[in-house]
Amino acid sequence: MKKLIALHLVFIATFYTYSQSLKTLATATTNQNIIDYVHSVDSTIIVIDFLQLKKSKWKSTFKTVSGLILSGGKDVGPKNYGVKDTFNLCITDPKRDEVELFLLSSALNDSLPILGICRGHQMTNVGQGGALYQDIPLQHKSDIKVIHRDSLQENYVYHDIELDTTSALFEIYGTRHLNVNSFHHQAVINEGGSMRTVARAADGICEAAEWGKGLDDRWIIGVQFHPERQFKTESIHTKLIKAYIEACFP
């Protein structure tokens, strides 16, 4: 007999909106990587795509969830961090921004665990008053060159990052250095709220941020890379989703 579902997980579709049954993940038609990542820990988790819900249902549906994942996708709209699209380079999704800002605010109010991935990491900071580089090559100056996105925008590139040894992220991974994938042209320049940078690339770009210690015991971690695309070949990345799920469902 299939065990009862005890944990609901909020999920915002990466790149495309998909038809989602609230009873099973079997009808998912996109971003199988995130679903596989979650189910590598617990295959009974229900994933709710709020982009498929009417706005009138957001509040009542959110009351059923135990955690929030904000995944990768298009650029966060610059107006959300108080600037114009200076370089006319941003490809945005205003509807998704609206949904995610609601979800983030609700999760913060309820002290729910939050995992941000790539865009989701950026949104976790922007939603708390942080800001982004609109374009790393144009705005970030460093003597050390790190490629954060394939110039053809077709493939992931890889580079090393260094973790803060006082961070929860370091405790999870158990190593100071990681080689991570990368597919982004924007990055966090100012952390939002009580977030603090806990990993950087060699050029100084923020590669991860988390809720500051000593404030309370809430679990909020954002990573600029895509662990859901590495965990099948590099099992160390399973540690992150496992820690997150354990925080959602202790």
Question: Where are these predicted regions, by residue range?
Answer:
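Active-site glycine-centered loops adjacent to acidic/histidine catalytic or metal-binding residues
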Residues: C118, H184, H226
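The feature captures the ABC ATPase H-loop/switch
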Residues: H121
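N-terminal beta1-alpha1 cap of cysteine-dependent amidohydrolase-like domains
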Residues: K2-F11, F15-L115, N125-Y133, P137-T166, ...
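Phosphate/adenylate-binding glycine loop and adjacent helical scaffold
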Residues: N179
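Conserved beta-strand residues within beta-sheet cores
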Residues: S182-H185, S194
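Active-site-proximal beta-strand elements of phosphoester/diester hydrolases
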Residues: I221-F225
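C-terminal closing repeat unit and adjoining cap/tail of repeat-based domains
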Residues: D217-W219
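Active-site nucleotide/adenylate-binding loops and adjacent lid/helix of ATP-dependent enzymes
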Residues: T175
